[in-house]
């Protein structure tokens, strides 16, 4: 389900924040040596995602506890290079919660209420 979760969220982002997504990724492509130049685009895309992407809004709302624990683990282990070892369990808990949100709410990428899966077929 992890790959499916990633695909659903990415499709949802592209569907609901297309300009922001394209502008940010174009900036990254054009500034491979210095991706820091794309900070503004990253912030604009992040804001759009938080405000307009249904799957992300649901995950952020319903999975705030595992998200906080994972974030705290990253902060606590940033200087020790042990993030993978110490935080993997928190990441797995967060992904399980996110998968449940997508699965239980039957979230599928859509634009203005039109299910994109219907368009693909």
Curated annotation (Swiss-Prot):
One GO cellular component, as annotated: mitochondrion
Keywords annotated in UniProt: Disulfide bond, Mitochondrion, Repeat
Motif range (Cx9C motif 2): 38-48
Motif Cx9C motif 3 positions after renumbering to this chain: 63-73
Motif stretch (Cx9C motif 4): 87-97
Subcellular location: Mitochondrion intermembrane space
Span of domain CHCH: 14-56, 60-105
Biological processes annotated in GO: aerobic respiration; cellular respiration
Protein name, UniProt field: Mitochondrial intermembrane space cysteine motif-containing protein MIX14
Positions occupied by motif Cx9C motif 1: 17-27
Organism of derivation: Saccharomyces cerevisiae (strain ATCC 204508 / S288c)
Domain of life: Eukaryota
Entry-linked PROSITE patterns: CHCH (PS51808)
InterPro entries membership: CHCH_domain-containing_protein (IPR052848), CX9C (IPR031731), Mix14 (IPR016611)
Pfam families per UniProt: CX9C (PF16860)
Disulphide-bridged cysteine pairs: 17-48, 27-38, 63-97, 73-87
Transmembrane segments: none
